UniProtKB/Swiss-Prot annotation:
Free-text cofactor note: Binds 1 zinc ion per subunit.
Description of how the protein assembles with itself and partners: Monomer.
Keyword Isomerase attached: no
Motif ('HIGH' region): 31-41
GO biological process: cysteinyl-tRNA aminoacylation
Gene: cysS
Single GO cellular component term: cytosol
Residues that hold ATP according to the record: K277
Tagged with keyword Secreted: no
Cofactor or coenzyme needed: Zn(2+)
Family statement drawn from the similarity comment of this UniProt entry: Belongs to the class-I aminoacyl-tRNA synthetase family.
Subcellular location: Cytoplasm
The protein, known as: Cysteine--tRNA ligase
């Protein structure tokens, strides 16, 4: 196939070929669900939503796993603060996540495992690492991974093990043989609630974060799979430690690794600064959905390549909204011929070439604008159908154009229609001052009225 993907492990863009012909298995690190998802989470899930969509468009069967971390120090702390069971908190936050990302058109994965459902698999994996001489128990009940015993540690992140310093994104715990070692099993603390403790041969406790993903990916995708994704911030230590665990358990001396292609999306900033609650620029998905519709947010994110740094700003969102409206305006009032995509069409061929080049959505979006220009000139039903179909592979332009242009920006359509009716009544009564006042008030809200022989219509400016 013609698809090429940038592999973080090799630092090169490579031709992609799945291990099993015709079937792609992909794992993406999902949310730790103690709070609402923020726009950085949205950026990550959007990136891999596009990946899985394009793999399917390319004729491949996709098994897509995106996990949920539902046991963690932050989760325990938040549940205690609220005085509720951990499961109640994580169920609530999972439902909120599904609602929020659904508004952005992010499709559900094939499997969405919760870490707490795989604790037995995690315990079994830790026991394999013990037998392989890579894990050791310490007084108090913790089990740690011996980093220096794993050959090749640091190859994903490019970090030399001797150059790594204790404390560089690695928690230093008492009882470690080496400051770089990381925890596989955390012994229970007396003050922790009962629902944070699980039984294991090492003693009661809970799994470390890193072992969770190794166990879940192995349980659902097997010892080797095609793509592992996540945010750039997970490259070290999380993904580095996953390699140490999974390869240390199943691939020592085999010449293979458990993942063929590692993908990482770029960092997100807000107004060119790191997103931080202390800076007052921290936004949840829900915060943004109060001001912009989900498709505008999606379109905004797809105008930047998934590996590039992404600057989140109101100016960028406003520009994206205008751009999306231009695309929908091209479809407004034009018959749209439903049809399979003809990939030999020049526009379709350019779109495919862009997406096959490491999912280059900015170039693909530029093709949509070129095609919209052709639709505006020709009013061709076939061109309009192609525009909608190509955009649909990205999760865009699937609403009726008139409906989106009127209501796609979260406006109160009932209020607007009532104001239009009031304006019509004022005009009929020859109260032109009132008619103009209503028109101007709507214009101030970004609503532009169009008077036609058939009546008054409106669009969001």
């Amino acid at each position: 196939m013609s698809l090429r993907i940038h592999n973080t492990l090799t630092r090169s863009t490579e031709a992609f070929s799945p291990i099993e012909p015709g079937h792609v298995r992909m794992y993406v690190c999902g949310m730790t669900i103690y709070d609402l998802c923020h726009v950085g989470h949205a950026r990550m899930m959007m990136a891999f939503d596009v990946v899985q969509r394009w793999l399917r468009v390319s004729g491949l069967r996709v098994t897509y796993v995106r996990n949920i971390t539902d046991i963690d120090d932050k989760i325990i702390k938040r549940a205690l603060e609220r005085g509720i069971p951990i499961r109640q908190l994580t169920d609530e936050m999972t439902a909120a996540m599904h609602q929020d990302i659904g508004a952005l058109g992010i499709e559900p994965p094939t499997h969405e495992p919760r870490a707490t459902e795989y604790v037995g698999a995690m315990v079994g994996l830790i026991e394999v690492l013990e037998r392989n001489g890579l894990a050791y128990r310490v007084p108090g009940g913790d089990v740690n991974y011996s980093v220096r015993k794993f050959p090749g540690y640091g190859r994903l992140s490019g970090k030399s093990i001797d150059a790594l310093r204790a404390g560089e994104r690695v928690a230093v715990l008492e009882g470690k043989d080496d400051p770089l070692d990381f925890v596989l099993w955390k012994a229970a603390k007396p003050e922790e609630p009962a629902d944070a403790k699980y039984d294991a041969p090492f003693g009661p406790g809970r799994p470390g974060w890193h072992i969770e993903c190794s166990a879940m990916s192995h349980a659902l995708l097997g010892e080797r799979f095609d793509i592992h994704g996540g945010g750039m911030d997970l490259q070290f230590p999380h993904h580095e430690n996953e390699i140490a665990q999974s390869d240390g358990a199943f691939h020592l001396g085999s010449g293979h690794s458990f993942v063929n292609v590692w993908m990482h999306n770029g960092f997100l900033n807000v107004d060119n600064e790191k997103m931080s609650k202390s800076l007052g620029n921290f936004f949840t998905i829900r915060d943004i959905l109060k001001r912009y519709d989900g498709e505008t947010i999606r379109f905004f994110m797809l105008r930047v390549h998934y590996r590039s740094p992404f600057n989140f700003s109101d100016a960028g969102l406003d520009d994206a909204r205008s751009g999306l409206r231009r695309l929908y305006t091209a479809l407004e009032g034009t018959a749209v011929a439903p049809a399979e995509i003809d990939w030999t069409d020049p526009h379709a061929a350019r779109f495919k070439a862009a997406m096959d080049d490491d999912f280059n959505t900015p170039i693909a979006v530029s093709v949509l604008f070129d095609l919209a220009g052709e639709v505006n000139r020709s009013r061709s039903a076939q061109s309009a159908g192609l525009l909608r179909s190509l955009a649909g592979t990205l999760g865009l332009l699937q609403q009726e154009a008139a409906q989106y242009l009127q209501g796609g920006s979260g406006v109160d359509t009932g209020h607007i229609e009532a104001q239009i009716a009031a304006r019509a009544a004022a005009k009929a009564a020859r109260d032109f001052a009132e008619s103009d006042r209503i028109r101007d008030a709507l214009a101030a809200q970004g609503i532009v009225l169009k008077d036609t022989p058939a009546g008054t219509t409106w669009v969001k400016a």
